[in-house]
């Protein structure tokens, strides 16, 4: 038998071995080194220990410190600071700083063969956090998990309990939808246990996303190129953006004309404008100027009389208070915020801002919600404020109610609103950053407006009939409205996308109503034909894409912003101004996923899966069953794609130049945002440069370089000179070769039909400029 000798520094045979038990009751063999005689020993049971009496070990009981105090765990330090101030002495408030456990990134981390059991681990950067929380929890008499009031927050609470080995019998779950003293006190007065149905719903979503992402992405790497990836919900969003782009590309504008007329009432002094609405009872179809000229000639010979004059009133109701999706949409339209920026600033307002005399106060309710409910306390405070500030005429007799858009809305949640309408935006502006103030003002105005009376418009509609010698009948219509009572509009008006138009008539003040009566003769003063072209559908903005996702049941309040961020961060979609444009990579990934994984990008399928996740959250479905039902067909699709998807790896394309650093050939590679130029000697040489895509236009500034399409670091497209930095010409819009007919300045493409001059800012129809260029 051998043992390690500390003097010889190697294993030696034990001389005169003696088997015994040490003081701790462990079997050892003692003796001396057979070479140098030094005492040695070896741990472990041997045959010689058989029959030896095992000593009785008396272990001293550890002194246990009595538990005292209450530990509260929240997600963020800012929230911890606010909540801690409300709770006061006796409470220790700590932040987990988000999730403390997650699936391993290095592998699937889902045991498909064992009921899809997830394999969680604590990330290295969170081990110290978990260690501290475990230590504090061991000393605390009571533990309160006060994470956010949604599925994600419930899951964080459960992971905290598991990772920090927190005793469930001493643990309480508390939820509040606003961080105010009253709300926090109410939550701690009514604690509950962790809702495992909500945890399972979040866990099921996480596992589904992992199965899809880690299933499809390796196939794309193998068949196409590395760095490509696909996800469950974001693939649907990408498909919407790609299909809209193809609609735009395939669109053929069609010409049509409209006709307006200036009419003067008999005996009147003021004319008004009316629009041709019917020809012989039919909607006018005027596709070309030839047909318009014939109609104009006939209309000039017609006699016109007033057929009807109708006055009325129209009410315009306020919009519902914000939910997550509508907040993101309006912040995009009115403030130019991305969905991610909106949620980040809203989080700051929710967690609390330092106010003089009040300390840190949460300014808005929880920002991830799909419910339009309002608490009775908030409702009463708001009605009192409206009555005092604006007067009784602006206050409805009964509070307005709003229908929640989604069936899955959690009715216990509230709409996004200020925690107190008495904190008017201008009064607390000095405590907020510029963006915080703008978003808080938007939320405050929308909420107050939602509890006010409708705006009332006075409407006027005049119909005039013209009868020609050719026995044709022309119906012309003039209509308008004037604001009679502003109602909620004194506070707020909903934003619109650039392509959206007001659903309003013209100004009725332009119609001389006192001079017009039925059967009165009208004199035709002038006709105004106008050429139009049908327009393609606009590209999605973040606001309009969120709206479509919500309307189709894709995603939930907590996922809209991550979906939009993901498709942009992966380089599948670029944000051009406010518009979303797919990249070459986006087209490629979408087409492959649509062909080989059609259910993943099917809107109805994804919506139904969201409904099943809602059923898990409500306890009406088992998460394992939902995943098993999904994974069976999906795994078959994976096998089919692995076998049938053709390899599309492109040959490395040489640029025709040598690397300036090492002399090897330069080649074109694909990156996140498309092509770039790299050294073929990579990774030994890491030289790169942008791939300059020329557009066939000479630089208008220097006249020597070519205008090339470039990308910013964030992937946004712009146009510059190929001679940069010697020439600093840049433009966000694509320049064209033609010059401005007015000033000779640079023309850029403003939209599908128009060009705009960067110098004089005049706009021109593309067709007209191109025709003039061809004739010249």
Predicted regions and their residues:
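Metal- or metallocofactor-binding catalytic centers and their adjacent structured scaffolds
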Residues: 283-320, 520
């Amino acid at each position: 038998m051998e043992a390690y000798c500390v003097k010889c520094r190697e294993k030696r045979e034990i001389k005169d071995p003696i088997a015994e038990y040490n003081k701790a009751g462990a079997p050892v063999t003692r003796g001396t080194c057979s070479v140098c005689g030094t005492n040695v020993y070896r741990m472990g049971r041997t045959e010689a220990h058989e029959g030896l009496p095992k000593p009785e070990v008396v272990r001293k009981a550890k002194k246990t410190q009595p538990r005292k105090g209450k530990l509260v765990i929240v997600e963020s330090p800012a929230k911890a600071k606010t909540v801690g101030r409300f709770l006061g002495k006796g409470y220790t408030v700590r932040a987990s700083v988000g999730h403390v456990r997650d699936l391993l990134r290095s592998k699937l981390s889902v045991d498909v063969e064992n009921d899809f059991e997830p394999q969680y681990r604590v990330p290295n950067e969170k081990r110290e956090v978990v260690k501290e929380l475990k230590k504090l929890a061991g000393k605390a008499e009571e533990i309160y998990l006060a994470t956010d009031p949604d599925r994600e927050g419930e899951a964080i609470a459960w992971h905290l309990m598991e990772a920090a080995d927190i005793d469930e019998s001493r643990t309480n779950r508390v939820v509040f939808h606003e961080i105010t003293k009253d709300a926090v006190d109410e939550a701690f007065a009514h604690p509950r246990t962790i809702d495992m149905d909500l945890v399972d719903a979040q866990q099921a979503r996480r596992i589904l996303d992992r199965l899809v992402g880690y299933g499809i992405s390796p196939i794309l790497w193998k068949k196409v190129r590395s760095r490509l990836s696909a996800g469950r919900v974001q693939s649907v969003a990408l498909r919407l953006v790609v299909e809209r782009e193809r609609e735009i590309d395939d669109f053929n504008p069609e010409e049509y004309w409209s006709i307006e007329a200036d009419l003067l009432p008999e005996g009147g002094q003021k004319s008004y404008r009316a629009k041709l609405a019917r020809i012989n009872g039919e909607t006018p179809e005027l596709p070309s100027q030839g047909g318009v000229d014939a109609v104009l000639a006939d209309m000039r010979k017609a006699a016109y009389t007033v057929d009807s004059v109708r006055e009325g009133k129209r009410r315009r109701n306020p919009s519902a208070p914000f939910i997550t999706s509508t907040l993101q949409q309006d912040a995009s339209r009115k403030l130019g915020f991305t969905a991610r920026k909106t949620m980040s600033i809203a989080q700051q307002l929710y967690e609390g801002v330092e106010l003089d005399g009040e300390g840190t106060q949460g300014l808005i309710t929880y920002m991830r919600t799909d419910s339009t409910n309002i608490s009775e306390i908030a409702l009463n405070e708001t009605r009192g404020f409206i009555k005092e500030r604006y007067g009784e005429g602006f206050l409805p007799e009964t509070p307005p109610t709003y229908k929640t858009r989604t069936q899955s809305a959690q009715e216990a949640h509230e709409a996004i609103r200020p925690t107190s309408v008495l904190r008017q935006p201008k009064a607390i502006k000095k405590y907020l950053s510029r963006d915080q103030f703008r978003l808080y003002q938007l939320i405050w105005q929308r909420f107050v407006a939602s509890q006010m009376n409708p705006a009332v418009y006075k409407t006027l509609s005049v119909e005039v009939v013209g009868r020609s010698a050719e026995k044709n009948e022309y119906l012309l219509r003039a209509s308008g409205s004037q604001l009679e009572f502003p109602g909620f509009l004194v506070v707020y008006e909903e934003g619109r996308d650039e392509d959206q138009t007001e659903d309003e008539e013209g100004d009725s003040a332009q119609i001389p109503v006192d001079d017009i009566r039925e059967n009165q003769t009208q004199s035709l003063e002038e006709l105004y034909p106008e050429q139009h072209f049908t327009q393609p559908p606009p590209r999605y903005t973040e606001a309009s894409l969120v709206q479509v996702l919500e309307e189709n049941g894709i995603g939930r309040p907590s996922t809209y912003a991550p979906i939009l961020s993901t498709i942009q961060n992966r380089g599948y979609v670029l944000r051009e101004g406010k518009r979303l444009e797919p990249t070459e990579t986006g087209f490629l990934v979408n087409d492959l996923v649509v062909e080989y994984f059609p259910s993943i990008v099917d809107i109805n399928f994804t919506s139904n899966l969201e409904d099943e996740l809602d059923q898990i959250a409500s306890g009406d479905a088992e998460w394992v069953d939902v995943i098993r039902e999904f994974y069976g067909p999906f795994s078959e699709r994976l096998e089919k794609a692995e076998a049938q998807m053709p390899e599309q790896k492109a040959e490395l394309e040489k640029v025709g130049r040598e690397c300036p650093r090492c002399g090897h050939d330069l080649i074109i590679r694909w990156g996140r945002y498309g092509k770039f130029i790299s050294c073929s000697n990579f990774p030994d040489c890491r030289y790169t440069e942008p791939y300059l895509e020329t557009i066939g236009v000479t630089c208008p500034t220097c006249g020597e370089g070519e205008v090339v399409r470039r990308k910013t670091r964030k992937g946004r497209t712009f146009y510059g000179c190929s001679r940069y930095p010697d020439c600093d010409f840049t433009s966000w819009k694509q320049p064209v070769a033609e010059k401005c007919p007015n000033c000779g300045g640079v023309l850029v493409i403003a939209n599908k039909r128009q060009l705009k001059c960067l110098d004089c800012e005049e706009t021109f129809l593309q067709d007209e400029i191109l025709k003039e260029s061809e004739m010249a």
